[in-house]
Amino acid sequence: MIQHPRIGIRPTIDGRRQGVRESLEVQTMNMAKSVADLISSTLKYPDGEPVECVISPSTIGRVPEAAASHELFKKSNVCATITVTPCWCYGSETMDMSPDIPHAIWGFNGTERPGAVYLAAVLASHAQKGIPAFGIYGRDVQEANDTDIPEDVKEKLLRYARAALATGLMRDTAYLSMGSVSMGIGGSIVNPDFFQEYLGMRNESVDMTEFTRRMDRGIYDPEEFERAMVWVKEHIKEGVDRNREDLILSKEEKEKQWEFVIKMFMIGRDLMVGNPRLAELGFEEEAVGHHALVAGFQGQRQWTDHFPNGDFMETFLNTQFDWNGIRKPFVFATENDSLNGVSMLFNYLLTNTPQIFADVRTYWSPEAVERVTGYTLEGRAAAGFLHLINSGSCTLDGTGQATRDGKPVMKPFWELDESEVQAMLENTDFPPANREYFRGGGFSTRFLTKGDMPVTMVRLNLLKGVGPVLQIAEGYTLELPEDVHHTLDNRTDSGWPTTWFAPRLTGKGAFKSVYDVMNNWGANHGAITYGHIGADLITLASMLRIPVNMHNVPEEDIFRPKNWSLFGTEDLESADYRACQLLGPLHK
């Protein structure tokens, strides 16, 4: 059984015996325990289990104790460390020198002992040795016997832990390409060096004929297939067929297509993570899967010109339920856009929530909306908005039909209930695919995302000579008047899933206007997650050494390793590029 990645907690202490060290043992170890309790009681893994921490076997005052801690962490699948101390310690003697995992240090802000002095000293050693570390120092002085973690310290500890766990969860997993390059899209030109050096992941690939091989040879669970067919007939609403009359399939042909796309879902899932049932059926090799944390399906055009498209498969892999019940989502990219798949993966690992994959299709200015509909935009939509619409697939969680405190949300699977599942299904239909585009047919996913959800749109791009760069746009989904929505939606393909999105503007740079956001977006796709998580993404990007070229996160929320400030404090964007370029990828 594969262990969860863990956070290692390192209590460091003044090594002087005969009074000094002894007086600090309890306070120092209690700091470590309080950090471990905070993380384990607040954060969860994608499977819903509490995050696990490992505390060093003793306080760390000298090199042998640092080495013992390091050995324990190596055996315990520790993916990141947090060093805590209320006092002076010996900097380079007590630091963790592992170069390939993130590090953070919390120096207690108290006057009796110089925890802040150690923090500054050890961060200087980290900078000298080229091993980045995050510095955490509370804003307010605490009493020496105060065991509470201040709110500002909690925020940084949790932001660091979320991002660090994401690096550990990615490591030693795979991106699985089902097919190859789709329609010349750059993101589907999969770059194995990026995956290996920045994420610690490997790449695997199968030809799309693997789907037909498994169908023809019965390499799927026939009992599950029968159960799925019953469930689909009971719960899935087939939408209006908008095809030309000569392209409309017969009822019998559509029935066959439903059977086909259900098998596609089952095979796509089994390819990613395996299925023990296949071994029982005599297919031991196929039963193990590809250990894929994220995958993509090429589809267009070689597959979709002949076979039903992948929309149903993609939709339900990214959704948190199917005929087997509520479960965690998969991360699955349309058109094998690996870079948008990774963007979705970053979002997912930071939030444990399913992701919207969308084309960043259109900027609608207030003037254009008024000209076309006669409606004057107001509220969050007043400056215009973006039409986010994928070509036929999207997680059903993207409907916004789940709620928390009466408001629409996308939430982890362990919070989802059956009434919310039913609401998602009732507010979605599955029209036959547009056969002018998808000659082989299939079924698209059609819904409208509810408005007023805080969301973050993300995109990873590759820039020759630089490497990966990340873009982040926080904002809100919108709910337009029904007639306005229909007028605008019908100008595209109204059989596809739509999200209206207004990024939060700052009045400068790429966020001077909604038009500037669209104009500076680096690719045709974006990954959209529930919540404003831009600050967490910036922290994660710094751990992976990926510079952020565009974001609208308030400066006070930016949390990067301390040595980033040594690259400059006025122009943080340029300093980020220089730091990432000098340090290089995390796993190189």
Swiss-Prot record:
<keyword id="KW-0119">Carbohydrate metabolism</keyword>
<feature type="binding site">
    <location>
        <position position="335"/>
    </location>
    <ligand>
        <name>Mn(2+)</name>
    </ligand>
</feature>
<dbReference type="GO" id="GO:0005737">
    <property type="term" value="C:cytoplasm"/>
</dbReference>
<dbReference type="GO" id="GO:0008736">
    <property type="term" value="F:L-fucose isomerase activity"/>
</dbReference>
<feature type="active site" description="Proton acceptor">
    <location>
        <position position="335"/>
    </location>
</feature>
<dbReference type="Pfam" id="PF02952">
    <property type="entry name" value="Fucose_iso_C"/>
</dbReference>
<dbReference type="InterPro" id="IPR015888">
    <property type="entry name" value="Fuc_isomerase_C"/>
</dbReference>
<feature type="binding site">
    <location>
        <position position="525"/>
    </location>
    <ligand>
        <name>Mn(2+)</name>
    </ligand>
</feature>
<keyword id="KW-0464">Manganese</keyword>
<dbReference type="InterPro" id="IPR038393">
    <property type="entry name" value="Fuc_iso_dom3_sf"/>
</dbReference>
<keyword id="KW-0479">Metal-binding</keyword>
<keyword id="KW-0294">Fucose metabolism</keyword>
<feature type="binding site">
    <location>
        <position position="359"/>
    </location>
    <ligand>
        <name>Mn(2+)</name>
    </ligand>
</feature>
<comment type="function">
    <text>Converts the aldose L-fucose into the corresponding ketose L-fuculose.</text>
</comment>
<dbReference type="InterPro" id="IPR012888">
    <property type="entry name" value="Fucose_iso_N1"/>
</dbReference>
<dbReference type="GO" id="GO:0008790">
    <property type="term" value="F:arabinose isomerase activity"/>
</dbReference>
<keyword id="KW-0963">Cytoplasm</keyword>
<comment type="similarity">
    <text>Belongs to the L-fucose isomerase family.</text>
</comment>
<dbReference type="Pfam" id="PF07881">
    <property type="entry name" value="Fucose_iso_N1"/>
</dbReference>
<dbReference type="InterPro" id="IPR012889">
    <property type="entry name" value="Fucose_isomerase_N2"/>
</dbReference>
<dbReference type="InterPro" id="IPR004216">
    <property type="entry name" value="Fuc/Ara_isomerase_C"/>
</dbReference>
<dbReference type="GO" id="GO:0042355">
    <property type="term" value="P:L-fucose catabolic process"/>
</dbReference>
<dbReference type="Pfam" id="PF07882">
    <property type="entry name" value="Fucose_iso_N2"/>
</dbReference>
<keyword id="KW-0413">Isomerase</keyword>
<dbReference type="GO" id="GO:0030145">
    <property type="term" value="F:manganese ion binding"/>
</dbReference>
<protein>
    <recommendedName>
        <fullName>L-fucose isomerase</fullName>
        <ecNumber>5.3.1.25</ecNumber>
    </recommendedName>
</protein>
<dbReference type="InterPro" id="IPR038392">
    <property type="entry name" value="Fucose_isomerase_dom2_sf"/>
</dbReference>
<dbReference type="InterPro" id="IPR009015">
    <property type="entry name" value="Fucose_isomerase_N/cen_sf"/>
</dbReference>
<feature type="active site" description="Proton acceptor">
    <location>
        <position position="359"/>
    </location>
</feature>
<comment type="pathway">
    <text>Carbohydrate degradation; L-fucose degradation; L-lactaldehyde and glycerone phosphate from L-fucose: step 1/3.</text>
</comment>
<dbReference type="GO" id="GO:0019571">
    <property type="term" value="P:D-arabinose catabolic process"/>
</dbReference>
<dbReference type="InterPro" id="IPR005763">
    <property type="entry name" value="Fucose_isomerase"/>
</dbReference>
<dbReference type="InterPro" id="IPR038391">
    <property type="entry name" value="Fucose_iso_dom1_sf"/>
</dbReference>
